[in-house]
Amino acid sequence: MPQLNTTVWPTIITSMLLTLFLLMQLKTLNMYYHPPASPKLMNIKPHNNPWEHKWTKIYSLHSLPLQS
């Protein structure tokens, strides 16, 4: 039975890996990657809330005097 010639295998494997690497590089070169998101500048209008102009006091139950 003849023996299998394996002397060219490293060359074949190296060329295969190089070809796969180049094909993947060409494939990813054609892809479009979105640029990173940047914060959007927004004009914030001040809200006109009626309770901001009034003085209000919130009473908690613990601060009220005891009723007997």
Swiss-Prot record:
Membrane topology per record: Single-pass membrane protein
Which Pfam families does the UniProt record give? Answer: ATP-synt_8
Transmembrane annotation, as ranges: 8-24
GO CC annotations, alphabetized: mitochondrial membrane; proton-transporting ATP synthase complex
Disulphide bridges in this chain? Answer: none
Q: Name one GO molecular function term.
A: proton transmembrane transporter activity
N6-acetyllysine: which positions carry it?
54, 57
- In the record, which positions carry N6-succinyllysine? 54
InterPro entries reported in the protein's UniProt record: ATP8_mammal, ATP8_metazoa
Superkingdom assignment: Eukaryota
Family stated for the protein in its record: Belongs to the ATPase protein 8 family.
Q: How does it assemble?
A: Component of the ATP synthase complex composed at least of ATP5F1A/subunit alpha, ATP5F1B/subunit beta, ATP5MC1/subunit c (homooctomer), MT-ATP6/subunit a, MT-ATP8/subunit 8, ATP5ME/subunit e, ATP5MF/subunit f, ATP5MG/subunit g, ATP5MK/subunit k, ATP5MJ/subunit j, ATP5F1C/subunit gamma, ATP5F1D/subunit delta, ATP5F1E/subunit epsilon, ATP5PF/subunit F6, ATP5PB/subunit b, ATP5PD/subunit d, ATP5PO/subunit OSCP.
Report the protein name in the record.
Answer: ATP synthase F(0) complex subunit 8
Species this protein is from: Symphalangus syndactylus (Siamang)
